[in-house]
Amino acid sequence: MRRRLTALFFVAAVSAAGAAAVAGARSDKAPAVARIPAIPVAHVSARTDRCPIPARFRGAFVAAANDTNLPLALLTAVAQVESRFEPTATSSAGAHGLLQVMPTTAAELNLSADDPKTNVLAGARYLKRLLDRFGSTDLALAAYNAGPTAVAKRGGAPNSETLTYVGNVNEIWRLLHGCS
């Protein structure tokens, strides 16, 4: 119990720090949101299984990580938050699959959002494009969630939902340190 409380405290501190970094992308301004509540990630734990990708999708994630030179742990964290590894997940906005890729984004990349393998590759390539554009993992994750136009216009995460999203991906990514 004590170990779990310590882990939750650490996750809360990391989430708040990550959210503050995303909110205050420019150091001359105070963060838009000084503090957000951490959302415990009960479905991912710090255990010996450092890379909890379902076996049937592991090859797609490894290939996408190699293709984009993104950390496998980061792609795993995005998939956990986006779909909890449910390949048929569809958002209210129309995003599909493991990495919740919009069909228009997949089409721009000449890939399918519906097939798990190409969905993971499309999501990874899109995240890499955002990372190259914004130069920051936190801003790239915010743009992945809220759209690059909203992040560019705001100079950071445009709303508390996006701050929470970035914090959740970051806390899972940290828990998955060593995932390979």
Regions found by a protein language model. Give the residues of each.
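Catalytic glycan-binding domains that act on GlcNAc-containing polysaccharides
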Residues: 30-180
